[in-house]
Swiss-Prot record:
This is Large ribosomal subunit protein eL42. GO terms for cellular component: ribonucleoprotein complex; ribosome. Pfam families: Ribosomal_L44. The lineage of its organism: Archaea, Methanobacteriati, Methanobacteriota, Thermococci, Thermococcales. One of its GO terms (biological process) is translation. Binds to the 23S rRNA. A zinc finger (C4-type) spans 11-74. Belongs to the eukaryotic ribosomal protein eL42 family. SUPFAM superfamilies: Zn-binding ribosomal proteins.
Amino acid sequence: MKYPKQIRTYCPYCKRHTIHKVERVKRRPRSELSAGQRRFRRVLKGYGGFPRPKPEGREKPVKKLDLRFVCTVCGRAHTRGKGFRVKRFELVEV
C-alpha cells in the first residue's frame, strides 16, 4: 500500500486542520520491569509447564501498522484511530 508522506488532517492540539508529517513507528521491546511482566515471571518460576493453555487457531500473518502524524505547526504527534493490517507499506511523495 502506498501512503503519502504528508497529509492534511485535524490536529487535536491546534484544534484545526494542518499539514502533518506521517511516520511509521517500530514497536519498542517489551519492558521487563513492568508489574505484569514481573508477575508473569513469578508464575513461571519453579516446576511445571506453562501456566496458560495454548491459544486456539493460528497466528495472524501480518502485524498492524502504527502510524504517527506529526503536526508541522505545533510539532506534536498523534495517532488517527486504530492501526490496520497491510502486507507491504510504503510512504511516497505526492
